[in-house]
């Protein structure tokens, strides 16, 4: 007992020391309002007016983004000589002291985007010139001109990555990037560049990635950056792209010319490693078959290139611009949103490695599938939103789509496809033929691939998983329409009467279907077989836009997660038993735009508690010719509904019968009371003389 006070004192002492130690750790972790972790000081958005002076001197990364610093003084960073990365994004910087980075010999990355460095660019340039080891510099969003940028980049020969995006640069010449022999990545997007003088990039022998998107370049002629691997010139006003002639080997792998005004297919290098070519949203077309080109002189264009005192003339064959281009390594080609009316002979044959071809939203009317076209490596082909009325398959090519996995033919004018087009398509998983007026073949189509039958046959395409036939004007399906397939996604929306009173045509794919869309197909509750119990793997079911008056039937182990019943004729919500069954798996249900009776929503509370009604605020019901939101339904509605359920004829009879009986009794009493006087009055009034 005598030792107890001693133990208590020692325990209190150790607890005090531990509390102080932990408090010190917490303070260190958030010193000066900044978060510290493994040499990184995160001071972003702290409303700091100057660089904190109480951070660990050994900090390697300092993040000061979104602070109103305005000025970076000469001594602001003197305490942090080990900095390797400094970020000053959106700090309202107008001035950087000329020796602000004097102690930062280890600095490798400097981010200064979205400031106002153009205000004192000369002093800023002087400060940057001391960073001999800098590798990454971000000057985007500083309202810099080309002269300002040239001064700031002067003598920074160690730079490997530079961003000058979102400035006001208009012209580029050899002086802007002079001495940047190690530069590998240059971002010039979102400027006002309309001219690039010859030799502007000649000194950038290590340049691999160049971004010129969102500028005002009218053309790129005599392109000769052989060392470049990716070039982005999207969102300009390019009308021509011509690589330099000769057999020089280009390292170019990705070329983005999308969203320009190109009229002709670009003249690409004769020897390159190009694997991605993006030509979306231009005005391109092939013209050889559209004009009378009997004279060779009518088929060429000459470009006069003036560079100082040197004049070069480049002659281009307008009708065969792709003939000399090296497309052997091309894997991804996007030609969507152009004016292509046809593909010339041999065009696709030059691309044996092509795996993705996008020809969406062009003017194609007829497509001839010839030998080795499409290439055997083709995985995805998009021909949607054209004017295709015919597909021609060369004889002897029934398995030309053997590698194809996705085939999009939607929004065309097709009535059918060549017989055998899908034969031996062992990998075909997705087909979209929506918005074509096609019909499904009642019997296997003819094996003659020469013509185009007026139907399409998907049977026995074992690899097919997703099929879209929306708004195809399909007639009633036969029971074997999808026999031999393992569909997981099926869209039959917009085909009124396609099921003809029964979902039996879908039984072949019922065990595998996961997503089924039957929107606007004319379903009614009078269907004798509108029972989805056999669809045990169904995850999503769309029954909107039909004429259902009651809930469809579900049974067995239900896996349904999404159910859409909008725009039907439902007057009552599902019964409690159905709601409890759906609650096990259902995550989302749509119930709005139905003429519900407010007296038929007794189970609304139970359904609401499940929190699965996605359009809860839009569900309404009718009560005494009024439309009321279910969420605003008053508490007294059940009493009103009890009165509305009473037979009104019986009610009127009960109200009128006592009144009639009372009136009859009153009349009888009156008659009996005044019977004798009344008879005398009648006799006196009706008395007349007799002739006798």
UniProtKB/Swiss-Prot annotation:
GO BP terms, alphabetized: immune response; inflammatory response; long-term memory; microglia development; sequestering of TGFbeta in extracellular matrix
Keywords: Cell membrane, Disulfide bond, Endoplasmic reticulum, Glycoprotein, Growth factor binding, Leucine-rich repeat, Membrane, Repeat, Signal, Transmembrane, Transmembrane helix
LRR repeat extents: 58-79, 82-103, 106-127, 133-155, 158-179, 182-203, 206-227, 228-248, 251-272, 273-294, 329-350, 353-374, 377-398, 403-424, 427-447, 463-484, 486-495, 512-534, 537-558, 559-580, 585-605
InterPro entries xrefs: Leu-rich_rpt (IPR001611), Leu-rich_rpt_typical-subtyp (IPR003591), LRR_dom_sf (IPR032675), SLRP (IPR050333)
A Pfam family of this chain: LRR_8
Extracellular side: 29-648
Gene3D superfamilies for this protein: Ribonuclease Inhibitor
UniProt similarity note: Belongs to the LRRC32/LRRC33 family.
Subunit structure comment from the entry: Interacts (via LRR repeats) with TLR2, TLR3, TLR4, TLR9 and probably other Toll-like receptors. Interacts with CYBB/NOX2; the interaction is direct. Interacts with TGFB1; associates via disulfide bonds with the Latency-associated peptide chain (LAP) regulatory chain of TGFB1, leading to regulate activation of TGF-beta-1.
Protein name (record): Transforming growth factor beta activator LRRC33
Organism: Bos taurus (Bovine)
């Amino acid at each position: 007992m005598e030792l107890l006070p001693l133990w208590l004192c020692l325990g209190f002492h150790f607890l005090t020391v531990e509390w102080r130690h932990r408090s010190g750790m917490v303070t260190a972790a958030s010193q000066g309002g900044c978060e510290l972790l493994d040499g990184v000081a995160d001071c972003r958005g702290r409303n700091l007016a100057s660089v904190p002076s109480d951070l660990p001197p050994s900090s390697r990364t300092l993040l000061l983004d979104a602070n109103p610093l305005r000025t970076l003084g000469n001594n602001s960073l003197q305490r942090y000589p080990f900095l390797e990365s400094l970020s000053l994004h959106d700090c309202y910087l107008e001035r950087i002291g000329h020796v602000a980075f004097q102690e930062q010999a280890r600095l490798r990355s400097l981010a200064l985007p979205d400031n106002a460095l153009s205000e004192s660019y000369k002093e800023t340039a002087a400060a940057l010139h001391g960073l001999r080891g800098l590798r990454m510099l971000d000057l985007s969003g500083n309202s810099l001109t080309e002269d300002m940028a040239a001064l700031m980049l002067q003598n920074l020969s160690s730079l490997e990555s530079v961003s000058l995006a979102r400035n006001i640069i208009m012209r580029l010449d050899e002086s802007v990037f002079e001495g940047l022999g190690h530069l590998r990545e240059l971002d010039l997007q979102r400027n006002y560049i309309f001219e690039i003088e010859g030799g502007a990039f000649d000194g950038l022998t290590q340049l691999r990635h160049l971004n010129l998107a969102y500028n005002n370049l009218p053309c790129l002629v005599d392109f000769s950056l052989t060392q470049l691997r990716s070039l982005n010139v999207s969102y300009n006003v390019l009308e021509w792209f011509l690589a330099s002639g000769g057999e020089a080997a280009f390292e170019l792998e990705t070329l983005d010319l999308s969203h320009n005004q190109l009229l002709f297919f670009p003249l690409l290098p004769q020897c390159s490693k190009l694997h991605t070519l993006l030509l979306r949203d231009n005005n391109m077309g092939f013209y050889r078959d559209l004009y009378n080109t009997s004279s060779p002189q009518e088929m060429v264009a000459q470009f006069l290139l003036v560079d100082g005192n040197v004049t070069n003339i480049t002659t281009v064959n307008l009708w065969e611009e792709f003939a000399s281009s090296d497309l052997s390594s091309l894997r991804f080609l996007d030609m969507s949103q152009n004016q292509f009316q046809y593909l010339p002979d041999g065009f696709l044959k030059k691309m044996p490695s092509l795996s993705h071809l996008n020809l969406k939203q062009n003017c194609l009317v007829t497509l001839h599938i010839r030998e080795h076209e499409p290439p055997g490596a083709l995985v995805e082909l998009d021909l949607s939103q054209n004017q295709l009325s015919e597909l021609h398959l060369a004889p002897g090519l029934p398995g030309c789509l053997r590698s194809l996995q996705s085939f999009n033919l939607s929004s065309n004018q097709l009535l059918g496809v060549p017989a055998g087009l899908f034969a031996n398509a062992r990998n075909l998983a997705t087909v979209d033929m929506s918005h074509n007026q096609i019909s499904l073949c009642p019997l296997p189509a003819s094996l003659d691939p020469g013509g185009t039958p007026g139907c399409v046959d998907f049977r026995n395409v074992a690899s097919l998983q997703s099929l879209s036939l929306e708004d195809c004007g399909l007639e009633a399906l036969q029971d074997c329409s999808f026999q031999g397939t393992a569909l997981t996604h099926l869209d039959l929306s917009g085909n009124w009467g396609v099921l003809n009173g029964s979902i039996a045509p879908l039984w072949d794919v019922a065990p595998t279907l996961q997503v089924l869309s039957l929107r606007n197909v004319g379903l009614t509750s009078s269907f004798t077989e509108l029972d989805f119990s056999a669809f045990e793997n169904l995850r999503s079911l769309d029954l909107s836009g039909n004429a259902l008056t009651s809930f469809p039937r579900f049974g067995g182990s239900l896996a349904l997660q999404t159910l859409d019943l909008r725009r039907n004729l439902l007057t009552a919500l599902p019964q409690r038993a159905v709601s409890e069954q759906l609650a096990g798996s259902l995550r989302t249900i749509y119930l709005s735009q139905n003429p519900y009776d407010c007296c038929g929503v007794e189970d609304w509370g139970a359904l609401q508690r499940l929190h699965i009604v996605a359009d809860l605020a839009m569900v309404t019901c009718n009560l005494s010719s009024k439309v009321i939101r279910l969420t605003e339904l008053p508490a007294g509605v059940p009493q009103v509904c009890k009165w509305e359920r009473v037979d009104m004829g019986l009610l009127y009879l009960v109200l009128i019968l006592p009144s009639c009986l009372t009136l009859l009794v009153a009349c009888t009493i009156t008659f009996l009371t005044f019977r004798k006087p009344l008879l005398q009055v009648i006799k006196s009034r009706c008395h007349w003389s007799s002739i006798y």
